[in-house]
Amino acid sequence: MNTPDQSQLGRVSGYADQYDASLLFPLPRQPKRHEIGVTGTPPFFGADLWTAFELSWLNLRGKPQVALAHITVPCETPNIIESKSFKLYLNSFNNTRFADAAQVQTRIRTDISEAAWRGSDRQATVGVKLVLPEMFDREPVQELDGLLLDRLDVECTHYTPAPELLHANHGEAPVTETLTSHLLKSNCLVTGQPDWGSVRIEYSGAQIDQSGLLRYLVSFRNHNEFHEQCVERIFMDLWTRCRPIKLSVYARYTRRGGLDINPLRTSHPQALPANVRTARQ
C-alpha cells in the first residue's frame, strides 16, 4: 500500500518527456476515511473533478499539440491519484507522438482508471474529456451559487478542524439552503504548502447555524490534508453533527502545477455538476 511520504511530493523530481504511465502514484482512500469514522460503505456519493491545464503532445509529424483535460474520478474508487505524480505523468506526453487527440484521451482514461482502481476486484473507467484550442472560448468562468457566509462578521479563534462549532436548530421547521464561502484554506498533507478553495454546501433539514459553519470552515486553515480528504471530513462532520436529511459538499480549489481538484460529496446520488472553473482558478 502506497503512503503519502513515499510520493514525489516535496522532493526534487526529474521530468520525463516520453510517455510513462508508471509515474502515476495512487494513494488509498481508506486510511483517512477511517479517521473520520467511515469504516464500511461510505455514506456519500460523488467524484473528484480534475482540470489539467498543461497537456501537450506531438502529432505524427512532430508538431506540438495542446489541450485542456477534464477528468472525473468517482469517489468509490479505492485510490486517489497523488497530484504531483499526475503532473509528472502528463508531462511525460510532451515529446511523445500520438496519431490524434482521441488516442491521447484513450491513453489517459486507461491509465487513470487502472491507477484509481488498483488493488480492487472491481474495475471501471474514469471520465476524460479533452478540450481542443478551437473550443477554448467555450470554457466559462462561473462562481459557486448560494448565500455567501463570508458576509458574517465573526470572530475566529480555531485554525484546526473544530466540529464542535457546528450546530443545527432541530426545534424549528426544516429548511433547504445553499451556502458558500471563499475562505476555505488547508495545507498539503506532505509539504504543508497552502491550498486555497471555495466551498458550496447545500442541505435540507434542521437549519445550520451560519456563524458556526463559517468559523468551522475557517478552522481548516492550518490543517494538513489533501483536497479530497478535507471535503469528506467536512461532509462527515456536518452529517453527524447537524443530521441533515440531504447534504452536498462541493469544493473548488485553486490550481497547482497546472492541475485543479474539485471534490463533490453528496448524501444521495445526483448528476455531477459541470466542471466549470471559478475566477480564482
UniProtKB/Swiss-Prot annotation:
Enzymatic class: oxidoreductase
In its UniProt entry, the species of origin is given as Paracidovorax citrulli (strain AAC00-1) (Acidovorax citrulli)
Active-site residues? 188, 195
Give the source's domain of life in one word. Answer: Bacteria
One of its GO biological process terms is:
queuosine biosynthetic process
Oligomeric form and interacting partners = Homodimer.
Q: Does the record bear Transcription in its keywords?
A: no
One annotated GO molecular function is:
preQ1 synthase activity
What biological function has been recorded for the protein in this entry?
Answer: Catalyzes the NADPH-dependent reduction of 7-cyano-7-deazaguanine (preQ0) to 7-aminomethyl-7-deazaguanine (preQ1).
**UniProt xrefs under InterPro entries:** GTP-CH-I_C/QueF, NADPH_dep_7-cyano-7-deazaG_red, QueF, QueF_N, QueF_type2
Q: What is catalysed by this protein? A: 7-aminomethyl-7-carbaguanine + 2 NADP(+) = 7-cyano-7-deazaguanine + 2 NADPH + 3 H(+)
Q: Provide the alphabetized UniProt keywords.
A: Cytoplasm, NADP, Oxidoreductase, Queuosine biosynthesis
Location within or outside the cell: Cytoplasm
Which residues hold NADPH?
Answer: 83-84, 256-257
For this UniProt entry, what's an example GO CC term? cytoplasm
Protein name per UniProt: NADPH-dependent 7-cyano-7-deazaguanine reductase
Pathway stated in the Swiss-Prot or TrEMBL entry: tRNA modification; tRNA-queuosine biosynthesis
**For substrate, which residues are the binding ones?**
81-83, 227-228
E.C. number, please? Answer: 1.7.1.13
Key word Cytoplasm present: yes
